Amino acid sequence: MPLLSVEKINPHTTLLLWKITETEEQLKGQLPENVLKTIVHKNYKSSSRRIEVMATYALLLSYLKKTSVIVHHKSNGQPLLDGFHISISHTNGYACVLLSTQNVVAIDIEYHSDRIARIRSKFLRNDEPFNSIDQLLVIWSAKETLYKYFSADDLMFDEMKVESISKSSLSMINLKTNEKRKVFYSLTSDYVLTYII
């Protein structure tokens, strides 16, 4: 598993990012039986989805230096891991995990694609005048991250607003509660990654 980065964001929070190159069979060989049973029980239809989930478990086991770890999920899909606040995301051959021992966190990763321009009306508000593919990718991912962060609010895209964008972050507001958050981002030719700490 080619780990691209382990970034210690602050003393309590770590961001893990890696490129998934393994086959499903290779990943099965890295996971304990109880983890494989959990994955089989979830009955993922897509092979690529199973690979992403297996890669996430392989990374967590390696990073946490444990022989077993199980990620549980709330009914809304939010992941739970004993001893940590955790957020997980995957896209076309990449996966990321954000772990914190103290604070709620959220993360999203999306592959770089021009398709975002076709769906802009799905996630952009009329008062968000952004046009470039890069801006649209960052905003799409940032709204996915904000949605995860405020998961209890069950936000719709039009209930999240971008107030400003800088070189490495966005200022965003949850319009249901008027709570503001800074969403950090990283943009490459392969993906955009956004997170809240």
What do these predicted ranges mean?
Residues 1-105, 109-197:
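Core catalytic alpha/beta fold that binds nucleotide/phospho-ligands
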